[in-house]
Amino acid sequence: MTGDVDMSLHPSGIIPELQNVVSTVNLGCTLELKEIAMQARNAEYNPKRFAAVIMRIRDPKTTALIFGSGKMVCTGAKSEQDSRTAARKYAKIVQKLGFPAKFTEFKIQNIVGSCDVKFPIRMEPLAYQHQQFCSYEPELFPGLIYRMLQPKIVLLIFVSGKVVLTGAKERTEIYRAFEQIYPVLTQFRKR
């Protein structure tokens, strides 16, 4: 598991696992969505519901939203590299259907990670002492929402000790945010 990971970046000994990487690409041409949906077997298009073709591939297991403008959103990848690989595969599928698609402006838009600190957390005192960063309304949502400023990451913290981190453009932001919150969480450990 930790073979090629620099553990000096993870003093807590916990490495958040990437759950979803969202990227965008510009295929650089306009697309006939109906045409794509009819020809590609892994595609669905329901313009009354959503103005994009929804296409899926198995490897890497991802979903793409392909818009008539040639813009594409790729979601579901578990790493930045998988996101790029998948986006290239979708571009190739569109090319094979006869469109002059190029692969331009690839950009990671969001990375979501999660981990488990393996101890329960006292939510109310955490929310109170860090109220400038927190919103916690357990009757609406069971998680505490912690908006970190540096790096600019949103964390969902659950009483169980599970933590979800979102809003990163690169994985190091996920790691940094977790290493910053970890000592805070240990202070609010349920005894």
Curated annotation (Swiss-Prot):
Cellular component per GO, a single term: nucleus
Subcellular location: Nucleus
Residues annotated as signal peptide: none
Record-level Gene Ontology MF annotations: DNA binding
GO biological process, one term: DNA-templated transcription initiation
Predominant subcellular localization, coarse grouping: nucleus
Keyword vocabulary terms for this entry: DNA-binding, Nucleus, Repeat, Transcription
Sequence repeats: 18-94, 108-185
Subunit structure comment from the entry: Belongs to the TFIID complex together with the TBP-associated factors (TAFs). Binds DNA as monomer.
Family in the record: Belongs to the TBP family.
Function field: General transcription factor that functions at the core of the DNA-binding multiprotein factor TFIID. Binding of TFIID to the TATA box is the initial transcriptional step of the pre-initiation complex (PIC), playing a role in the activation of eukaryotic genes transcribed by RNA polymerase II.
Name recorded for this polypeptide: TATA-box-binding protein
Protein species of origin: Acetabularia peniculus
